[in-house]
């Protein structure tokens, strides 16, 4: 699915948002972002937002998403709902490029608002799952698929976090999915990315 979304232009993507009844505000321009927007509510019942206080989120550039990432998050929301997740707190989506940096085309990953660093998951009953504290990753281990690391003996929240990632990977909701098993910089979040032009899925 991520491959299909990555090929959409702004008009096609926004038309799909309309079909899905996703509330958003169009952003006129955000450097490096093809289809910038701000969310105006939950996506399929799940609230995605940064760690900023609510009053700051309304104008912060860190709350800008590319439309194509939002479509992928809408699909992922169906997976999250199976585990009673109602809120996802991220460390980063859009990282504006420096003003003096010359851009050659659209940005990628965070510079194009096409990636989210999901860090904290809150459930309907008030529980919180932190990737940093609850995933229990091991660098070099395989989180999903054939030869994935065993979950025997892991706490329930660690198992749930793996299911959240691996079910998304199986459905190919994102092109790139990096977990704490990948390296130290990803110890505290899941990096989930829609990659323009990609016809592959990488899960580490």
Residue ranges and their predicted role:
Residues 85-93, 134-136, 197:
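An acidic- and aromatic-residue-enriched active-site/binding cleft used to recognize and process polar
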Residues 34-38, 96-102, 188-191:
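Short, solvent-exposed polar/charged micro-motifs at secondary-structure junctions
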Residues 61-90, 96-128:
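Mid-length scaffold segments of soluble, non-membrane domains
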Residues 4-90:
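Active-site acidic/histidine clusters and adjacent loop/turn architecture
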